Amino acid sequence: MEGSGEHGETSKGPLSKGVSRGLCILDLIFRVIAVIGTLASAIAMGTTNQTMPFFTQFVQFKERYSDLPTLTFFVVANSIASAYLIISLPLSIVHIIRSRAKYSRLILIFFDVAMLALVTAAASAGAAIVYLAHNGNVSANWFAICQQFDSFCERISGSLIGSFAAMVVLILLILLSAVALARR
């Protein structure tokens, strides 16, 4: 009965290695998905602008993401998170090859949490501005601009989707890394 694996003991056999390798592959897949989400959000927001003529072609109103510092923060934060995630991809591949690496996984968890905080702050700030763009604020006499700049608003609203998706994937990455460390 000693080798039966009862009473909370875990097996270090081939099945355990297969599960660890599976967790590492899932980590790599999640990182690629998070790169796509953050990079797409940064590009979509960073290339957003719309020009609207006012009475004549000589007088025009132009709306750009860079007109609002919050949206600039959104682009920078998602770019930083995307760069980090791209840099972390080789380390994630190393974990597939050497699934016993403990310290590098701890470093990844630390930076994953920092990137989660950064992306959460950026997505939340961006969502507040998008809400104001769609609805305005009557008490502050801020008018909704989305009725005039519809293309601009569609793009900034769409860029939030990738950022919030990346947030969810980063949470899953942190949980996955915690499970992988707990299995050691």
UniProtKB/Swiss-Prot annotation:
| Alphabetized InterPro entries for the sequence | CASP/CASPL (IPR006459), CASP_dom (IPR006702), CASPL (IPR044173)
Query: Where in or outside the cell?
Result: Cell membrane
**GO CC annotations on file:** plasma membrane
Its domain of life reads Eukaryota
List residues in topological domain: Extracellular.
44-72, 127-159
Q: What is any one GO biological process for this UniProt entry?
A: cell wall organization
Q: Which residues are glycosylated?
A: 49, 137
- Which named protein is this? Casparian strip membrane protein 3
